[in-house]
């Protein structure tokens, strides 16, 4: 089973991908962050430059993950991905009209990506602003990230309505570092039960 986790910047995608991957013990494919990406990408995102190049870069990154998964997927497995074709489409909202046609051509990279579920995370801007400030990344300007989140989140909500296997989950009040938050996601997305590792009280 393949599950894509998508949403605007600062929503908690990377955390949820890692946490659910660990919970299911089947692996997860994140998009990474600073240190993984080409150093020019973050600067171009912050400055609103090179929209087609940025979009193509993330499309190629996601595509590498999907190609690698093909050799690891199997019946009974649940594999989580950060990002999907809908991600590339949602981010188009932050770029000018003159770039839209070129951006649409880049979308073709994601035509072969398939999922059993797409979890679309959304939340209030207050929650996102809190998470952005908590992660305290020096290369992120909180006000700009919140502005971008509003644009991208609105696009995700609209796009999700046309995806037959998308489930929109409002993450306000959900903590992805707590079992209760992860269980809420599993239930809302109708994912199969994860295997429990038994914990026992044992005498010395």
Residue ranges and their predicted role:
Residues 8:
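P-loop (Walker A) phosphate-binding loop of NTP-binding proteins
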Residues 2:
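Walker A (P-loop) ATP-phosphate-binding motif of ABC ATPase nucleotide-binding domains
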Residues 70-73, 79-138:
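ATP-dependent NMP and nucleoside kinases share a basic, alpha-helical "lid"
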Residues 16, 20:
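Hydrophobic positions on the alpha1 helix immediately C-terminal to the Walker A/P-loop
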Residues 22-67:
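Conserved substrate/cofactor phosphate-moiety recognition/catalytic segment
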Residues 13:
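Conserved lysine of the Walker
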Residues 5:
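Hydrophobic anchor at the beta1->P-loop junction of P-loop NTPases
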Residues 133-139, 145-204:
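NTP-dependent small-molecule kinase module
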């Amino acid at each position: 089973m393949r599950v894509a986790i998508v949403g605007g910047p600062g929503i908690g995608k990377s955390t949820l991908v890692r946490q659910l991957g660990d919970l299911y013990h089947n692996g997860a494919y994140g998009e990474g962050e600073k240190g993984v990406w080409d150093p020019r990408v973050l600067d171009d995102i912050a400055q609103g430059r090179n929209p087609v190049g940025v979009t193509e870069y993330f499309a190629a990154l996601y595509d590498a993950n999907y190609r690698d998964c093909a050799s690891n997927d199997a019946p009974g497995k649940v594999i989580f991905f950060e990002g999907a074709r809908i991600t590339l489409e949602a981010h188009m909202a932050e770029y000018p009209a003159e770039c839209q046609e070129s951006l649409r051509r880049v979308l073709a990279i994601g035509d072969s990506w398939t999922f059993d579920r797409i979890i679309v995370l959304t939340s209030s801007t207050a929650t996102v602003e809190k998470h952005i400030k908590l992660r305290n990344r020096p290369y992120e300007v909180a006000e700009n990230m919140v502005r971008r989140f509003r644009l991208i989140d609105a696009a995700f909500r609209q796009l999700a309505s046309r995806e037959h296997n998308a489930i929109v989950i409002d993450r306000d009040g959900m903590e992805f570092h707590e079992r209760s938050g992860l269980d809420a996601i599993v239930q809302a997305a109708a994912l199969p039960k994860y295997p429990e590792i038994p914990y026992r009280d044992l005498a010395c």
